[in-house]
Regions:
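Hydrophobic alpha-helical scaffolding
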Residues: 111, 115-118, 174-181, 271, ...
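Short hydrophobic alpha-helices at membrane interfaces in multi-pass membrane enzymes
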Residues: 319-322, 384-399
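Amphipathic, glycine/alanine/valine-rich membrane-attaching segments
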Residues: 52, 350-358
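Soluble extramembrane regions of membrane proteins in the secretory/endomembrane system
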Residues: 1-232
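Core alpha-helical transmembrane segments of integral membrane proteins
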Residues: 220-353, 363-383
Length: 424
């Protein structure tokens, strides 16, 4: 593994311009010492200038493990270092303790404890904001830990920014190029930019705020859509792959046994092949609707499959193949020109939860597009008996997949370029 991350990049950046850091709080339990939060602000030597991660808990039987964070003490110590520090990290800790203790709590007691902890955090945040000058400060609220299964099944972590130059609305960054979605890699560059520190040895980009009405509703909507696509992706592609393999075996059997393709079995096989060819388009078109539950996802698939099956019965196979192929190419072209808005929530698109890619063409989509581009070239060659138009289409396909502001997929570019050279 050649990946060598720079440990302590944010701390080094801040220390390089003479500013100081601080860290308060912990997620300790009565059995384990958990103090990983300070890793965010430490420098490459593991140093933080101020803080208290040791003597910061109170005994309280109403809280998990009988302990809770002493927010009054944190506020008091923050006041004493306010003028000396430029970056302060606070690990509230209590929600982490609740999460690890939740197996021992009934649902009712769990929610009671959670509401109690959230109330404490809310009061603490309010007290902090009251002591901050908004025009000289930035407050970042984030929950980078795994979600609690009893609350929701979201695998995306929330992030809230407050302070100078931050509009009411949603967040984005050039790392993701998606409204409402940022990467955890963007946190350090955002802090460094605000403090006018160098952004060095950091992989992300500064977060930007976008003024947008109905921000909460929008975030909830895309969170649900992203979650459903992520949950159904592997199972959908697995089933699709298995059906394709079974269909191929069926086709081999039909041709080996020299079964007449004009009888009922042959016609069924042809329609099945046509439907399988249309499945990626069905997955794309169904994602255009507000699919926020697995039930809606399955219903939309059934509707589109029924619709395509009806079309396949009404028109000849060759005409359907031409129509579907042209529709595919048009959809992919429009999708790239519209920054991926058509395929954004499709199971064939990239998954922001995984974080391997946020824009451009993912490998699944490139695989489909490679087949479509070569088929289009073949159809045009058959229609016009001339290589010029097919070659132009293939070269356009290479640009679509390879351009950094469009497909941005190196492997896909090489594959389509190879197909183009072979065609020529």
């Amino acid at each position: 593994n050649n990946y060598s991350p720079y440990i302590g990049a944010l701390g080094d950046s801040i220390h390089s311009i003479g500013l100081k850091t601080a860290s308060y709080g912990n997620s300790d339990t009565d059995e384990e010492v958990i103090r990983s939060a300070p890793l965010i602000v430490m420098d490459s030597k593991g140093l933080i200038d101020y803080g208290n991660v040791e003597d910061i808990l109170l005994e309280d039987i109403d809280y998990p493990y009988g302990i809770r964070t002493d927010y009054d003490k944190i506020l008091s110590e923050l006041v004493t270092v306010k003028e000396e520090t430029s970056l302060v990290l606070v690990d509230t800790g209590d929600l982490n303790r609740l999460n690890s203790y939740s197996d021992f709590l009934s649902t009712d007691v769990f929610y009671q404890k959670r509401n109690l902890i959230l109330r404490d955090i809310d009061i603490f945040i309010g007290d902090m904001v009251a002591n901050l000058d908004k025009e000289r400060s930035m407050l970042m609220l984030l929950s980078p830990n795994a979600g609690e299964g009893r609350i929701d099944s979201s695998r995306l972590s929330p992030l809230i920014l407050w302070g100078k130059g931050i509009d009411k609305g949603i967040l984005t960054s050039s790392t993701t190029n998606r409204e409402g979605v940022i990467s955890n890699l963007d946190i350090s560059p955002t802090v460094a930019e605000f403090l006018k520190a160098p952004i060095e040895n950091m992989a992300g980009n500064p977060i930007q705020s976008l003024n947008r009405s109905g921000a909460v509703e929008y975030i909830n909507s895309i969170n649900n859509c992203i979650g459903i696509a992520s949950k159904t992706r592997s199972k959908t592609l697995l089933v699709y792959g298995i059906v394709i393999i079974l269909t191929m075996l069926m086709g081999i059997a039909l041709f080996t046994l020299k079964i007449n393709m004009d009888n009922r079995l042959g016609i069924t096989f042809k329609r099945l092949c046509l439907l399988l060819y249309a499945i990626p388009m069905i997955l794309i078109l169904s994602s255009l609707f507000n699919i926020d539950s697995i039930a809606k996802y399955l219903i939309s698939l059934m509707i589109f499959i029924s619709l395509f099956n009806f079309i396949g019965k009404e028109y000849d196979s060759k005409g359907c193949i031409y129509l579907i192929t042209i529709a595919y190419f048009t959809i992919f072209l429009l999708d790239l020109l519209l920054d991926g808005n058509i395929t954004r929530y499709s199971v064939l698109s990239h998954d922001p939860i995984i974080g391997a890619r946020y824009f451009g063409m993912g490998n699944e989509m490139v695989g489909v597009f490679l087949a479509i581009a070569t088929l289009i070239a073949g159809i045009l060659m058959d229609r016009f008996k001339n290589k010029l138009i097919p070659v132009i289409v293939l070269l356009l396909s290479v640009i679509m997949v390879g351009h950094p502001r469009l497909g941005a997929n190196v492997g896909g570019t090489l594959a389509i370029l190879s197909a183009t050279l072979y065609f020529i």
